[in-house]
Amino acid sequence: MKILVTGGAGFIGSAVVRHIINNTQDSVVNVDKLTYAGNLESLADVSDSERYAFEHADICDAVAMSRIFAQHQPDAVMHLAAESHVDRSITGPAAFIETNIVGTYVLLEAARNYWSALNDEKKKSFRFHHISTDEVYGDLPHPDEANNNEALPLFTETTAYAPSSPYSASKASSDHLVRAWKRTYGLPTIVTNCSNNYGPYHFPEKLIPLVILNALEGKALPIYGKGDQIRDWLYVEDHARALYTVVTEGKAGETYNIGGHNEKKNIDVVLTICDLLDEIVPKEKSYREQITYVADRPGHDRRYAIDADKISRELGWKPQETFESGIRKTVEWYLANTNWVENVKSGTYQSWIEQNYEGRQ
């Protein structure tokens, strides 16, 4: 099987590529524009494989996408290419509209034109797997808002969409496009919506890598608001396994939620990281003393939580890592891979961090 993976140099995309090359006999064509968060060093361990090919291309480029489909003849698409950082979407939403909505449309059309020319057997087995986020659902009631002993709801595959940020609105739009191409044209699509990912090779603008690296450098550990926002945390390698399971075994037209069963307040995540660093690389004062509280971001959702029963029941997938085991692996990886970290921390990244966090008081 040959799988075309868009965004394969990104955080989740590179985990998917590594999983396929290291754990299956399938081939990968990695299509990536290599924007600031795309890093081919994340694929150094698999880039020499005969089953791996790289195409430096933008999913918004219709000519390039048509050529890539015609040249590589994939059996499936795993579409991960996206602008994905909520804070960046607030200060610069245009890139999110262009990549996440227009790019998905261009890719769908290239896939549809390619798929329509396949023989019946290949048409039936072809899959266009669109990887999305739980943020399209909006937010859920927080424990602070619940009555005593009241069970808190979870996001299911039938939860209504209510995106809060330009990022989540752009992903919701792309989800709707993918489902429309199934219903209108018959393209065999699948959508997955996942919770917050963490793990190795994560670009250091997101909470967990930002906290690890700032802590080690003696910098402030910025916490939005009171830090009581709740997220469900999913180890990225567990997510990669889930995505491969869906593209190879999932039913066309279906949606699958993917979660880690690890609801944590942001402040508790940060405290856990500080305690691990106190254990592994202790210093005179606890890393907890570097925690600082900054103004919350606009429209910040208070709670996300995934019901992943469907993928477990129908496809047999379950996460292997607990949050405790996964966060320890993550901290240890960043401590052991300082060269990777230094190479991704460009001047552009530094100026963005200063603008986004140091201006919040």
Swiss-Prot record:
Belongs to the NAD(P)-dependent epimerase/dehydratase family. dTDP-glucose dehydratase subfamily. Keywords: Lipopolysaccharide biosynthesis, Lyase, NAD. Its EC number is 4.2.1.46. GO terms for biological process: dTDP-rhamnose biosynthetic process; lipopolysaccharide biosynthetic process; O antigen biosynthetic process; polysaccharide biosynthetic process. Pathway: Carbohydrate biosynthesis; dTDP-L-rhamnose biosynthesis; Bacterial outer membrane biogenesis; LPS O-antigen biosynthesis. Homodimer. Substrate binds at residues 84, 133, 196, 206-207, 222-224, 231, 266, 296-300. The active site is at D134 (proton donor), E135 (proton acceptor), Y167 (proton acceptor). Its cofactor is NAD(+). InterPro entries: dTDP_Gluc_deHydtase, NAD(P)-bd_dom, NAD(P)-bd_dom_sf. Binds 1 NAD(+) per subunit. It comes from Shigella flexneri. Catalyzes the dehydration of dTDP-D-glucose to form dTDP-6-deoxy-D-xylo-4-hexulose via a three-step process involving oxidation, dehydration and reduction. The gene is rfbB. PANTHER family: DTDP-D-GLUCOSE 4,6-DEHYDRATASE-RELATED (PTHR43000). This is dTDP-glucose 4,6-dehydratase. It holds the Pfam family GDP_Man_Dehyd. It is an enzyme of class 4 (lyase). NAD(+) binds at residues 11-12, 32-35, 58-59, 80-84, 99, 167-171, 197. It comes from the Bacteria. CDD domains: dTDP_GD_SDR_e. GO terms for molecular function: dTDP-glucose 4,6-dehydratase activity. It catalyses: dTDP-alpha-D-glucose = dTDP-4-dehydro-6-deoxy-alpha-D-glucose + H2O.
